[in-house]
Each structure stands twice: as structure tokens, then as C-alpha cells.
Amino acid sequence: MAAVAKPVQAWADDDDIDDGTTERLPDPQTIVNKDGTKTIISWRFNDQGQKVKTTRRVRLTTHREVVNPRVAERKKWEKFGLSAKDGPGPASDTTSVGENIIFRPSANWRKDQKDESKDANANAMKDKLKDKKVKCRICNGEHFTARCPYKDTMAPIGEAAPAGGVGGGGDDEGGILSAPGAAGGAGAKKGSYVPPALRGDRKEGEKMGGGAGGKYGERDDLATLRVTNVSEMAEEQELRDMFERFGRVTRVFLAKDRDTGLAKGFAFISFADREDAVKACNKMDGWGFKHLILRVEFAKKAT
């Protein structure tokens, strides 16, 4: 009897031939226990080719959380695009879930900061700088009295101007100005500073009017209105527009806070003609402006 020749196989099919010598791993098993846990048994080969059995015990815990209904509704939206077939929840290959940091502000967060009231150096510095704020004695603005635009036409608030001018009082800068009448006399104190406009026999109001009681000096002295109870949101242009209805306005000064830029509640309006100032005072006194009632009166002039 002739021998039957064994068919020759291609070398590419050698890997596909299972001769039964390769050991297979058992299928993973999942066992449900009586206490509600699950035992998952799996098998694998380690680096030495040894078969390793892995047993994991898993307990499923349901965590109930009260969330915004809008958030819960968005979680039920159907996915689209390349993630249309993905299950609910974030997919590991398309979504990176970071750590959920819950921010809970404390009601006593100020106590956690450094208590500056217990710092002796801070208190000493506050006491040192307490009286360093510049304040004008004429209009209460945040500038030196010597630089006040109304120093030649108004007396300091709450004070009566001395005869011969307002230059005899103290200034914010600590300098002592001699009285105008004594500035040009032989008894003037040596070394005291006298403004150029007040040297000699000149008096206040003469530097722009020519002589004492000059036309411009009288007009500037008697045609300035002091407006109080002004809203902190007011602007100089708004005040100019309101008062220009009664005549030509030559100057508008609105005192503002240096830090916030808001109005400090008072302003000065100067008219070219006193008759226009009288009409404006009678009409605008008690006028409502930005939910406040304006108080308009003639500014105190220097006597």
C-alpha cells in the first residue's frame, strides 16, 4: 500500500497552527456575593511567562447628590458626532476629568488675615500721617489755601475776613503771611513772604481790575455763587449748562475727591454780571438736581 503524502503548508501559516502545546488562560469570572459585593477573577501572564490569578472584590455604592435641575437635564442630552455611540458619562478617550475642588468661603475670613490693629508700627505710622491731608480753608478742596482759585474773592469758611485782606491768617503749608497793609510799610517783619499781588499799597482785587474797587474786582467779588448739596455724580459741564441760562459764566469750580474722583458736595459759580448771578441764585436755590435739592447762595466775599 502506497504511503499518502502529507500536504505541504506555507510558512506564513505556521503561526496560525495550534498544535495544542500553548496553554490558554481561563475566562474571567464574576461572582455575586450575598452581601451585595462582586468578586471578579481574572488571569494573566507575567514577564516570566507564569500564569497569575487576580481576584478583586468590588462593592458598588450609590451616592445621591442634589444638583441644579438644569445640570441634571444637560447630563441626559444625547451625544453627537464621533461620540454618538458612547455611553452616558465622560469617555476616557475624549474627556479628561480633573479634580473637583469645592470652594467654600469662610464667614470669618477677615480674622484669618493679619490684625493690623495689634501692630505697633502700623499704629504709629497712622498717627504720624493722620493730619497730613491737605485741605483748603476757603473752599475745603484738596489743595493748599495759597493755590485756591477763590482766595482773592472769598473769605475762609466760618471765618470773618480781617480788614485789609485775608492774608493775615495761617496757611496749610505752615508759612505766616503778613497782612497786606503791613506788607509795604516800614514795620513789615523782615523775612516774611508777601505775594507779589499784595506788595506795596495794593489790595486784593486790584491785580486784575487796575485799582481798588476796580470794575473787574467788584464783579468777581460780588458775582460768585456757592452751590451746596451737589450730587457726587455731578460734573462741571452740567453745572455750567444749568447756570449759563441766566448769563455768561466765567468760572466753574467743582470740588472733587482726589482718590475717587467723585464730587464732594459743593461748587462755586462765577458770573460776569452780578444781575445774572442774582437771577440764578433766586431761580436755582431749591432746584432739584440728580435727586438732591440744591442750596445756592452768594459766596462770602473778602472785606
Curated annotation (Swiss-Prot):
Residues 1-32, 81-100, 105-126, 181-215 are annotated as: Disordered. GO terms for cellular component: eukaryotic 43S preinitiation complex; eukaryotic 48S preinitiation complex; eukaryotic translation initiation factor 3 complex. Coiled coil: none annotated. Gene3D superfamilies: 3.30.70.330. GO terms for biological process: formation of cytoplasmic translation initiation complex. Disulfide bonds: none annotated. One of its GO terms (molecular function) is RNA binding. It is found in: Cytoplasm. Pfam families: eIF3g, RRM_1. It comes from the Eukaryota. RNA-binding component of the eukaryotic translation initiation factor 3 (eIF-3) complex, which is involved in protein synthesis of a specialized repertoire of mRNAs and, together with other initiation factors, stimulates binding of mRNA and methionyl-tRNAi to the 40S ribosome. The eIF-3 complex specifically targets and initiates translation of a subset of mRNAs involved in cell proliferation. This subunit can bind 18S rRNA. This is Eukaryotic translation initiation factor 3 subunit G. It comes from Pyricularia oryzae (strain 70-15 / ATCC MYA-4617 / FGSC 8958). The lineage of its organism: Eukaryota, Fungi, Dikarya, Ascomycota, Pezizomycotina.
